[in-house]
Amino acid sequence: SLACREIEYEVIPAALANNVGLLARSPLASGFLSGNYTRGGGAEQGTRLGSESAMFGQIGNSFFASEQNWATLEGVTQIADEAGVTPSQVALSWVTNRPSVTSTIFSARTLTQLESNLPAGDLHLGEEATARLNAVSAPTPNDEPHGPPAFSSVTAMSTPASRNTANSLPSEPGGGVQLLVVKEKGS
């Protein structure tokens, strides 16, 4: 996602070099890039990042603590406003059109979210919008959550002491449906 681009260091180059397609997961950064969060507002209960799940709470704290992620969200929102689409559609389109990405999985808790996000499959961001998003979200080594600390902090929650919450699926209203968007070859 625009909020977590560490795969660009090795995974995408390796996939391109070996002609391997990638399945992108969590392109909305667990909902952070949906446009539903504001600086200083925190996560509302009933949202994925506002759930009682230790894992999503840690992920949310990581996203909310990053000045770069807030700048990225502002960039996504600005481009969405200019294009007359939603921030979710911009974030989904950006991920789906990354090099080597052949499919994208995203989640929707409600039918409204699903219906709002589906048009992203037909949205093609222009070069200028893509360049702006690339610039504002550019990964930097060891800059959480762009580097290994984001993964190690989530992995640390999977220790036996926290296993009951970290490895359980969120209950309603944090649950939902995951969808797979497949890009046609050559599109």
For the regions a language model picked out, list residue spans one by one:
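Acidic/histidine-enriched, glycine/proline-rich intrinsically disordered or flexible terminal extensions
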Residues: 144-169
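Short, intrinsically disordered C-terminal tails of secreted or membrane-associated proteins
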Residues: 178-186
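Beta/alpha (TIM)-barrel catalytic core signal, keyed to glycine-rich beta->alpha loops juxtaposed to Asp/Glu
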Residues: 1-136, 159-160, 171-175, 179
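Serine residues within intrinsically disordered or low-complexity segments
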Residues: 168-171, 187
